[in-house]
Amino acid sequence: MTDSFYFDNTNGVKTLRCRTLDEIGFKKHCFTTRAGGVSRGYLSETNLSFSREARENVLENYRRVFEAAGFSGSAVLSNQEHTDIVLTVDGTHKTGGFWTADRAADGFVTNERGLCLVIFVADCVPVIIADPQKKAAACVHSGWRGTALGITAAAVRKLMQNYG
């Protein structure tokens, strides 16, 4: 691992963070690991998928991750299907809990503070794009299909269209 990334272990929740994002003011971000959650068995420990486990366990895992990352707001999620679809989310998506897109998408853009953009990856690439001047960000799930379709470029275009 390079000096650009570092592990953080807050209250037993181990996350990976990016120094560059910290330095440009995007301090509340993280890449999760499995360490620090309440899930057991094949899901252990920090399962964040509502489709595979009791809701109360998943909510507790999110609470722990958010606390470790210093985040206290709303989270947005989608059903990822290896597309090039990037959704814009804003203050209307602040539910005080979780907002799930009503259609498939593999990325989000926003300039709204207090929104956690959640993507899931296994063997795909998580992409975070940050614009420190506009205080806007994109979070992208880029698998081989999405990469071939140009999802990262779609996220950059959406950032430029929405925020200049």
Question: What residue spans do the PLM features occupy?
Answer:
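Active-site microenvironment for binding and transforming phosphate-containing groups
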Residues: 1-164
